[in-house]
């Protein structure tokens, strides 16, 4: 899969509210806030299932009710359409899980 150009990444980010291009590497990132740890963990569980099905996995960390996510396609050396698709799926899952 080919890396997205800078203009393609910017266009994709316009359709992904809350997602930002990371300065330190070619990746996109976002933080999600939930009511509590259980909601955050439920979100991560649902994303894990979707990510496994897509064979594309996020870099993430969880502290209590916050989940920080970074997406990049390591094989391509940057952001690809796979990252954009997973970001959209994560946003939909987050909404269903009560993200604030």
From Swiss-Prot:
Q: What is its EC number?
A: 4.2.1.96
Gene3D superfamilies reported in the protein's UniProt record: Transcriptional coactivator/pterin dehydratase
List the molecular function annotations (GO) for this entry. 4-alpha-hydroxytetrahydrobiopterin dehydratase activity
Under catalytic activity, the entry for this protein gives:
(4aS,6R)-4a-hydroxy-L-erythro-5,6,7,8-tetrahydrobiopterin = (6R)-L-erythro-6,7-dihydrobiopterin + H2O
> Where is the chain membrane-spanning?
none
Record bears the keyword Lyase = yes
Record keywords: Lyase
Q: Which domain of life is it from?
A: Bacteria
Please name the GO terms of the biological process aspect recorded for this protein, alphabetically. Answer: tetrahydrobiopterin biosynthetic process
- A Pfam family of the record is Pterin_4a
Tell me its family: Belongs to the pterin-4-alpha-carbinolamine dehydratase family.
- What this protein is called in its record is Putative pterin-4-alpha-carbinolamine dehydratase
Q: Which organism is it from?
A: Rhodopseudomonas palustris (strain ATCC BAA-98 / CGA009)
């Amino acid at each position: 899969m080919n890396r997205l150009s800078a203009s393609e990444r910017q266009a994709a980010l316009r359709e992904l509210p809350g997602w930002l291009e990371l300065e330190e590497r070619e990746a996109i990132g976002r933080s999600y806030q939930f009511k509590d740890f259980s909601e955050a963990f439920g979100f991560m569980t649902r994303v894990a299932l979707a990510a496994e099905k897509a064979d594309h996995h996020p870099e993430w960390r969880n502290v209590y009710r916050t989940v920080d996510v970074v997406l990049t396609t390591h094989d391509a050396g940057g952001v690809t359409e796979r990252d954009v698709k997973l970001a959209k799926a994560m946003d939909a899952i987050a909404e269903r899980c009560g993200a604030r």
